[in-house]
């Protein structure tokens, strides 16, 4: 709410002038600014109401800017840590981020939502960093017990991400990226619109990269195989609109590389 004061004479505003002068260093400039905005006889309260409203907006902007720098630094740090522990996962996350961004653009989603999806994709598997490395990087098929452990990574990632002040629902998006429309996904078994749109986009991008790319236990199966999976199960596992946008955006693509789409600066 705007700052308001009750006195009706100029001298009654000296405490405010003193405060502003102490902060900005020139009472004459403040006085001239007030006159230029409201005239020689303008009510001083108008000036203070305006000034403190501006102050409030500047504070909000500064807070938003700090939050932006915080999440950018966090994402970069996570990427570096993941790369040092598991280069495959780090590369996978970058490719998924490119692909998810391309799908979201193809869908015509708002720019801010696209950026939120990209950021979530960059850290969507970070929960694996809290799991035993020998399981995450195992060069063979996983046992049922190991699979159950791996399935904890969305929840682990969400718990970590909740500690960061993201301007998007990043923790929830990461938590839900293995959910499926028919409720067969994990960890919550969500169905349909219970799954965030951001997570539905991320899910398709994740599956396409996982199938087409090399895994620790098998070679890559190629982009055509991945797209057949998406096409076959659209409307069942995967959101139909997201799946169609993916198929359109990758039409004619033979390989999926980390520079398929350009990262925003």
Name every feature range the model reports, one short phrase each.
Residues 2-61, 65, 69-72:
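N-terminal membrane insertion elements
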Residues 38-39, 43-44, 50, 63, ...:
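Metal-dependent catalytic cores of enzymes that make or break cyclic nucleotides
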């Amino acid at each position: 709410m705007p700052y308001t004061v009750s006195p009706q004479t100029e001298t009654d505003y000296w405490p405010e002038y003193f405060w502003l002068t102490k902060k900005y260093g020139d009472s004459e400039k403040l006085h001239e600014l007030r006159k230029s905005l409201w005239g020689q006889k303008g009510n001083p309260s108008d000036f203070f109401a305006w000034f403190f409203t501006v102050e409030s907006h500047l504070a909000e902007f500064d807070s938003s800017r700090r939050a932006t720098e915080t999440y950018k630094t966090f994402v970069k740090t996570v990427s570096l840590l993941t790369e040092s522990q598991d280069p495959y996962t780090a590369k996978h996350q970058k490719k998924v981020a490119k692909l998810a961004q391309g799908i979201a653009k193809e869908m015509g989603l708002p720019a801010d939502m696209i950026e939120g999806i990209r950021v979530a994709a960059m850290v969507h598997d970070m929960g694996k960093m809290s799991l035993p490395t020998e399981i995450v990087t195992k060069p063979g098929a996983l046992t049922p017990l190991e699979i159950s452990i791996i399935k904890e990574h969305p929840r682990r990632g969400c718990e970590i991400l909740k500690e960061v002040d993201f301007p998007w629902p990043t923790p929830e998006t990461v938590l839900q990226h293995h959910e499926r429309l028919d409720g067969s996904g994990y960890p919550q078994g969500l169905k349909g619109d219970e799954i965030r749109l951001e997570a539905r986009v991320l899910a398709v991008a994740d599956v396409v990269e996982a199938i087409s790319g090399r895994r620790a236990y098998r070679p890559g199966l190629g982009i055509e195989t991945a797209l057949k999976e998406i096409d076959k199960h659209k409307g069942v596992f995967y959101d139909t609109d997201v799946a169609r946008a993916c198929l359109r955006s990758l039409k004619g693509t033979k390989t999926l590389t980390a520079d398929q789409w350009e990262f925003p600066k």
